């Protein structure tokens, strides 16, 4: 059974950056994509991007203009998202998810518990 364990809640200042981790277990890390999704009340779910650890390939939501950088460490089966130049609009719950692509669209079948990010001075 696939399991994704995310790092804990973060409280950071505006203008700084943060790195959230997602450790995978129970499956071959390099055989699936890891996607990242932003959840904000009143805004639903927003796909940020995804990474294929087996080759380091990445896809990003063009609307986010370089807000996020996705990386993966195959030695520890851990994926990371770094968010930069943080503002209050970045306050949200961030989820990682295991995915596959079908007909050029990602499908996620296992989700992390979510990491709450609060950006406040």
From Swiss-Prot:
Coiled coil: none annotated. Residues 1-112 form the Ig-like domain. Keywords: Adaptive immunity, Immunity, Immunoglobulin. This is Ig heavy chain V region MPC 11. GO terms for cellular component: extracellular region; immunoglobulin complex. PANTHER family: IMMUNOGLOBULIN HEAVY CHAIN. GO terms for molecular function: antigen binding. CDD domains: IgV_H. SMART domains: IG (SM00409), IGv (SM00406). InterPro entries: Ig-like_dom (IPR007110), Ig-like_dom_sf (IPR036179), Ig-like_fold (IPR013783), Ig_sub (IPR003599), Ig_V-set (IPR013106), IgHV (IPR050199). This sequence was translated from an mRNA isolated from a myeloma that secretes IgG2b. It comes from Mus musculus. One of its GO terms (biological process) is immunoglobulin mediated immune response. It comes from the Eukaryota.
């Amino acid at each position: 059974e696939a399991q994704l364990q995310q790092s804990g809640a973060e409280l950071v200042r505006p203008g700084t950056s943060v790195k959230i981790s997602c450790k995978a277990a129970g499956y071959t890390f390099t055989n699936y994509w890891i996607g990242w999704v932003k959840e904000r009340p009143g805004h639903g779910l927003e796909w940020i991007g995804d990474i294929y650890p087996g080759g380091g390939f990445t896809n990003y939501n063009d609307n986010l203009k370089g807000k996020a950088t996705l990386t993966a460490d195959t030695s520890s089966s851990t994926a990371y998202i770094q968010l930069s130049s943080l503002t209050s609009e970045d306050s949200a719950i961030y989820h990682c998810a295991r995915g596959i692509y079908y007909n050029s669209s990602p499908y996620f079948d296992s989700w992390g518990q979510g990491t709450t990010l609060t950006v406040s001075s």
